[in-house]
A protein has these predicted regions:
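Conserved P-loop NTPase motor cores
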Residues: 1-112, 119, 139, 146-148
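A short, structural micro-pattern
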Residues: 77-78, 125-127
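A short, acidic, amphipathic alpha-helical segment used as a generic capping/interface helix at domain edges
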Residues: 116-125
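P-loop NTPase catalytic cores that bind/hydrolyze ATP
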Residues: 126-147
Length: 149
């Protein structure tokens, strides 16, 4: 799998993309961490101009941290136009996503204004029927549409 992934990345890196005649390529890397460490940061930064997008799928950010460093994982996520979160069990992952989504103005029980996470860290592990899409303009909470139901 690693050899094939590497060859695809190399092909796209050298590809001369003409948006008038060439089709865009979507590279979906499921169980991303299981592929092992390879140079993904450079392709992530420049694949869009080569007519390609990378979709990294993983069960946990901790899986990526085991293969890449936490800093490399942050660079990967920072270069992602969209992040889709189905759920998160790890407390540091939940905190990270809550910080990424940001805070909203709210009120406490006495009516005083306060800023709270738009999505509380505990909520991430309770997503059974919803998902969150994080993008440059903010976030959106969507209902999951199960094909098998």
């Amino acid at each position: 799998m690693r050899v094939i992934s590497g060859q695809v990345m190399e092909y796209i890196s050298g590809r001369i993309y003409d948006k008038r005649k060439d089709k865009r390529i979507l590279v979906a890397l499921d169980e991303f961490a299981s592929i092992g460490h390879f140079e993904v940061l450079s392709p992530f930064r420049k694949f869009r101009k080569n007519g390609a997008n990378i979709c990294i799928l993983t069960q946990s950010l901790a899986d990526i941290d085991l293969v890449y460093s936490e800093k490399e994982r942050r660079v990967i996520l920072d270069n992602s136009a969209y992040i889709v979160v189905l759920s998160a069990n790890d407390s540091s992952t939940r905190q990270y996503f809550s910080e990424l989504v940001g805070r909203e103005q709210g009120h406490d029980k006495r009516g005083n204004e306060k800023r709270e996470f738009a999505v509380q860290p505990e909520e991430w592990k309770e997503f059974t029927n919803h998902l969150v899409v994080i993008h440059a303009g903010g976030y959106v909470k969507l209902k999951k549409n199960f094909y098998f139901k």
